[in-house]
Amino acid sequence: MSILIKGALLDGAVTDVYIEKKEIRQVGTDLQVQADQVIDGRRKALIPGFVNAHTHAAMTLFRGFGDDMPLMPWLEQKIWPNEAKLTREDVYWGTKLACLEMIKSGTTTFFDMYHKFRATADAVEEMGLRALLAGVCFDHFKPELAEKSKRENEKLVVDVENYSKRIRYAVGPHAIYTVSGELLQWIHGFAAEHSVPIHLHLAETEGEVRNSIKQFGFTPVRYLYKLGILSPRLIIAHGIYVDDDEIRMLADHGVKVVHNPASNMKLASGIQFKFCEMRKAGVTVALGTDGCSSSNNLDMIEAMKLASLLGKAWRKDPEAIPASEIFQAATEAGALAIGLKAGRIAEGYLADLCLVDLDIQIDQTEIR
């Protein structure tokens, strides 16, 4: 199957893009090639599809639930008790709704962490998106739960082969306060053995940092360093509370970080995410929406806006985090973080693209 997009606007220039076997083969002006399908790109902007690098798709079912609460009471009193009641069918339909929402706002790939992996995978398979799905690990420092998580993920790494190549598996230890050091070290070895990523919430709140020092004797990043699990396979969500030395640790070990501005604001976890400092140190910084209960939507355009405005506000610097940098975080950096050659409109990259209609009419009567 080949596709030719004719006359679209790419970085302000009229451009043609030729696609073959889901890959961009040529980018230029007035391409003279034959294609199975020709798309009229006139008056449309051509952009890479967004990569939502951290979310919990089926939490569309919890949108607006548990509002106005800090993280731990929100998790312990609202989210975890109700997640325990979800059926496989609930997760399936919640994920399908999430996929629809992401498609409508330009997301083509997402990185998910949630229960009932197979229900999520079935929904994604049917909706046509690309996804990296993390098999969740909790043990709450109980050996019997650690063994259960190990056995489940040993099955998932095999089961994912039953799906198309659009769907990949990662291992997802929830956080250092719900997963023991022993299980984290097992996960590190398991991920290396199977060449899969690891996804973990880390350094999300000041309370997490205080408790980490009290429980383990180290801040969260230093604790992972002590355990020996900082590596290029590790992708951490949030990473708000890190100092300069820890940023260097992350960079030196190739750890990727996903910024989630909406949920950080809603849960008042923190707003001083060190986007500029991490990028300068060489850390790949991607962007995510988090789940709908803690951010209320899966709109990566809103996530870009919030990330940029927050960064400018707390730094008191209107030049911080320009549009080009935050757009790169939402596209190419997200793809790089999860191991995809996507997020750029260039030869050899996956043709995960969006056309934005520049002539949409807005009915002013509907917004008065």
Predicted regions and their residues:
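Histidine-rich, glycine-flanked metal-binding segment
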Residues: 1-4, 9-47
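Histidine-centered catalytic micro-motifs
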Residues: 49-60, 197-206
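Active-site gating loops and adjacent loop-to-helix segments of metal-dependent hydrolytic enzymes
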Residues: 61-93, 127-142, 147, 206-231, ...
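Alpha-helical scaffold segments that flank or form the walls of functional sites
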Residues: 63-128, 150-163
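Metal-coordinating catalytic core of metallo-dependent amide/deamination hydrolases
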Residues: 120-239
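Short acidic/histidine-rich active-site segments
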Residues: 198-206, 268-270, 277-303, 345-353
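Histidine/acidic-residue-rich catalytic or RNA/ligand-binding cores of hydrolases
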Residues: 206-218, 246-251, 268-278, 295-312
